[in-house]
A protein has these predicted regions:
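A short core secondary-structure module
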Residues: 110, 114-156
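A glycine-rich, basic-preceded beta-loop-alpha segment at the flavin cofactor/substrate interface
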Residues: 152-155, 159, 171-203, 220-238
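Short Gly/Pro-enriched turn/cap motifs at secondary-structure boundaries
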Residues: 90-93, 119-122, 138, 164-171
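Single conserved hydrophobic/aromatic residue that forms the stacking wall/gate
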Residues: 1-6, 10
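Glycine- and acidic
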Residues: 15-22, 37-43, 52-58, 66, ...
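Internal helix-loop-helix
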Residues: 11-78, 120-123
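Internal maturation/activation junctions in enzymes
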Residues: 7, 52-53, 64-100, 109
Length: 244
């Protein structure tokens, strides 16, 4: 199960693989991390989603400040989970249309997020990178910023978990932000045009690794069956149509 897989991975300290050792990471380059993502996905693609989303921390490490590094990166290295909250009911591939609202709370010296995110992989994660509209009156990508939401702060409800065909070990959620406390990651207005672009490049690599791992696992299953299944007094792998 995904829970037992998570327990095994945490015991072996395979989180924060690419993060510096001073934060509790392993300081690996991206290549061995991607190889591990492929292996994990071959064993359990659902857990692979949960585990591989640790690469969201790359974006926080690259664009966050030192205070955010010291507070958040050790938590991911210790096994806490992450998600990237981008998609909305009216903003799928067209992320310029994101309307989840971010307003600055001067009294509390923090940002507040209000709105809905949909189809969020690992939506019950501990730390979320959230794309939100911080510039009032804007309608395009230049009005979007990236925020860090910590589950410990509260203010976000999981309204729905999607009933998917597979990958059940990783919940895909609809999230409702209700005045949720958050903090800015990097600079305002660069959420989509800079930070999400970097975030998605890492995610695409992770999905590719997951796909290769799943394909290899499916091939191994098919090969084992073809060697075991017998028809006309021989294993079906000996028939050219199957062997090819």
């Amino acid at each position: 199960s995904s829970s037992s897989a998570a327990s095994d991975v945490y015991k072996r300290q395979l989180n924060g693989m690419t993060m510096p050792r001073r934060f509790g990471g392993l300081n690996f380059p991206i290549t061995p991390y991607t190889m591990c993502a492929e292996i994990v996905a071959a064993a359990d693609a659902g857990f692979g989603n949960i585990w591989a989303l640790q690469d969201c921390i790359e974006t926080l490490y690259e664009f966050g400040n030192e205070d955010q590094h010291s507070r958040f990166i050790p938590r991911i290295c210790a096994g806490e989970t992450m998600s990237m909250d981008l998609t909305e009911p009216d903003a799928g591939s067209d992320l310029q249309s994101v309307m989840l609202k971010a307003t600055f709370d001067e009294k509390e010296n923090c940002w507040r997020l209000n709105g809905v995110k949909r189809f969020i992989t690992n939506g019950d994660a501990d730390l979320h990178l959230v794309l939100a509209r911080s510039e009032e009156g804007t309608r395009d990508g230049r009005g979007l910023s990236m925020f860090i939401y910590d589950k410990r702060e509260g203010g976000v409800d999981v309204r729905r978990i999607e009933n998917k065909l597979g990958i059940h070990g990783s919940p895909t959620c609809e999230l409702v932000y209700k005045n949720a406390k958050a903090e800015l990651c990097g600079d305002r207005k660069l959420g989509l045009i800079k930070y999400v672009m970097a975030l998605m490049n890492g995610a695409r690599l992770g999905i590719a690794a997951q796909s290769v791992g799943l394909s290899q696992a499916a091939y191994n299953e098919g090969l084992a069956y073809a060697k075991d299944r017998k028809q006309f007094n021989k294993a079906i792998i000996e028939f050219p149509a199957v062997y090819d």
